């Protein structure tokens, strides 16, 4: 098993800390935030429509905490960390693409409302990079 390579430290630390922080913020999110996040996700993923918003936010937060921690742990291989990040960010990119208000009509370029979510594309790129450099 291969472990963390020094050349991957900057991307793993920056991305891991960012995702971990986002998860911790969501973990303590209020009902208003839960409704907003749930509504966006349920629009792209209909299977979430029947899930209570607060439960959805808590599960999303737990996922972010797990992925962020995985990236930060030095004994987790690049392949495993990359797989976790690719799966997680791939789901976010899919949501971005399925939500018309987030990107310009007929384009993948973000609208002002979509800029915050469009950053998930670079996380997908980092995840794929970790997968090809195990």
Locate predicted features.
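Membrane-interface extramembranous regions
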Residues: 1-66, 73-134
């Amino acid at each position: 098993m291969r472990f963390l390579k020094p050349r991957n430290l900057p991307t793993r630390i920056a991305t891991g800390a960012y995702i971990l922080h986002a998860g911790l913020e969501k973990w303590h999110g209020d009902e208003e935030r839960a409704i907003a996040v749930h509504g966006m996700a349920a629009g792209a993923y209909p299977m979430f429509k029947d899930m209570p918003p607060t439960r959805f936010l808590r599960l999303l937060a737990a996922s972010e905490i797990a992925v962020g921690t995985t990236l930060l742990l030095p004994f987790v291989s690049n392949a495993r960390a990359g797989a976790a990040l690719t799966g997680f960010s791939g789901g976010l990119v899919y949501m971005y693409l399925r939500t018309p208000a987030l990107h310009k009509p007929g384009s993948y370029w973000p609208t002002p409302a979509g800029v915050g979510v469009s950053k998930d594309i670079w996380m997908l790129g980092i995840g794929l990079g970790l997968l090809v450099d195990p």
